[in-house]
């Protein structure tokens, strides 16, 4: 316990009401956030002579100050606790690493509704279906829907400015509501209603309506229409057979738990209307000495209460671990959802099988993760030994990418003890230098990255410079001139140069620009981690450069093609539905655009591709 903090005097002032407390260290940083039904009773437990765990002992030893916020109810305290955890990211709390919002399928409220992928707050008028576990699952579903129910997916800016149908209409993926006379209002509205029912899990209603229409078409001798409806029915049935899990129309989140060697995996299975939308594994950041009960309770709280306004809550949550206060979580989620949300930890029947599936997935994912972590840990230990460092907690690596000096991009990738920290990867657009001057580019990115205040925990142990002696010299000169509050002498600057034939395993490492380099054995784990972070940095830079180059190229290439003036350019973009469909189109598809000959289509195709 910190000598600076007078716990006895503090506890005399604490109320017994529900609320949230924030613990600070000597630097004023929030190190822990907690909630309590009885603040006095809970906070007193931290200052007993026999504490529950080493983690608690380490926490209490750093307490310099405690702030308390009283709430009316325990539910308010629970919500406020998770808002504070999200805000402060305290190092002694279990932290959910991935907090980005989940994607939904959005059906707009326009006169001719469109389908789109959506993340974030639900401000736009329309209907939202989901959540889906990732963007890929949404895009796959949208592609499927487009084949079965051809309603538009184009942006309103494209839709409002069309005079001819685009390629999507030509290949049967859109009914073409943008052009008058191609589809009746009733037919388009019917397809929109099918989409709405399908996404709501009411597949039987869709099939029954389609069967009824097919029979009516047959009676009217409209055999082409009947055949089209038959194909649509078969497509819907194929999809629903693949997705089917339960005939109860369940809306469930099923959470399996695995915990080993201080690492936790929580695998969430998303089931909506009896269909599996997908699943996802989460690996929360777990402070040393944390009990599994705290990991699970904190994860569940953060998962559902942080950003809850953007999440569609299920009717039921199945959990592979008993919570101490499941009623509190259920009441809080019920209040947020405006309807009953149940939390079950001992389900039976089909629900028990769902939970077993989630548990198996969690265990498998954790085993894979631990294996990867073990490899990364061994490699970092070997590198620390090779460079005579006590340990390596954080590494950063820089690379430069450009084409003949144009669209120069610098990348910075970050590794910690667990491997790549992709959320902290950064790209920097380099400007104001002589084209092709890699030294100036490196100088600029290092000044932008390190010429400011940095948290102590974010100061890297190693800064890897891809490029050898010259680039290392730039790094040394930048660091010599830095005037910053953090210890600029802490990072080890390490240059890496590829061999003459640029083969992996022939890299030369430099600690000084003027000194001799040294090489590590090709089978060295230390070399493997250097290759890993360097390749990550290179790929990150290349990807950023290509995106930047493509943006410039694609906006200007059409203007440079002989025979393509403003009118034809506008016609191409309108007819194809925008630049991206044009980039993906074949010569034959481009030649269908009015005013574009076969020869001109070939010229356009090759100009855009090369």
UniProtKB/Swiss-Prot annotation:
Keyword terms: Cytoplasm, DNA damage, DNA excision, DNA repair, Excision nuclease, SOS response
Location in the cell: Cytoplasm
One GO term (biological process): nucleotide-excision repair
Record carries keyword DNA repair: yes
Keyword Calcium: no
Disulfide feature: none
UVR domain segment(s): 204-239
InterPro entries, sorted: GIY-YIG_endonuc, GIY-YIG_endonuc_sf, GIY-YIG_UvrC_Cho, Hlx-hairpin-Hlx_DNA-bd_motif, RuvA_2-like, UVR_dom, UVR_dom_sf, UvrABC_protein_C
One MF term in the entry's GO annotations: DNA binding
Domain GIY-YIG: 16-94
Cellular component terms (Gene Ontology): cytoplasm; excinuclease repair complex
Family of this protein: Belongs to the UvrC family.
UniProt subunit comment: Interacts with UvrB in an incision complex.
Role summary: The UvrABC repair system catalyzes the recognition and processing of DNA lesions. UvrC both incises the 5' and 3' sides of the lesion. The N-terminal half is responsible for the 3' incision and the C-terminal half is responsible for the 5' incision.
UniProt-recorded name of the protein: UvrABC system protein C
